[in-house]
Amino acid sequence: VTAKKAILVLLGVVAAAILLSTLSHRVAAERQQDALDAFYATPPDVAAAAPGAVFRREPLPNLQIAGARTYRLLYRTERTDGSAAVSGAIAIVPTAAAPAAGRPVLAWAHGTVGLGRGCAPSRREHPLQSVPWIADAVANGFVVIAPDYAGLGTAGPSEYLIGRAEANDLTNAVRALDNVPDAAP
C-alpha cells in the first residue's frame, strides 16, 4: 500500500508540474502580446494617410537572418469596403548594397495558424522560424515583405481568406517598403 501511495503522490506532483508549466507558458505568451499592443494600436490619422504609409517600424530581434535586417511594421491598408485600416508586416531587407536598378521584392501572402492576436506573424515570438527559403531569397538580393493582414493582430474585423482584402494588404505592404531603409524596390 505504501508503494501505491508513493506512486500516486509522484503522479500528482508530475501532473501539477505539467499544469504549472502550461499555465506559466500561457501567462508569458499573454504578457508578450500585451507588451506589443501599443505598437499595433491604430493611430488616429489612419484615414488621412496614403495606402502603404508606415506608422511604426522597429527591429525584430527574434528574427535573425544572415545578411539581413528584419523589421516589424504597422502600415496603412484598406478593407474591402474601401475604408482605411492598419496591418502589421514583417520586412526583411538584405544588408548588401542595393543594385542600381533597385531591389527585387518577394511579397509573400502566407497562411496563418489562427485568428487570435498572437497568430499574426509579426507578433509571434519566433516569426518565420520554419521558413527556410527566406534566407535564400535574401542571399539572392530580394527584400521579403509578409503582411499579417488587417484585423489579424490589429483592431477591427479580420477579412482573412477574402481575396480582395489580402490583395489590398499585400499591395500596400509592398508600398510600405518605400518607408523602410534600403528596402525601396
Feature locations, PLM:
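N-terminal export and membrane-targeting signals
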Residues: V1-V13
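Short, surface-exposed "cap/lid" segments of acyl-processing enzymes
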Residues: T80-V86, I92-A137
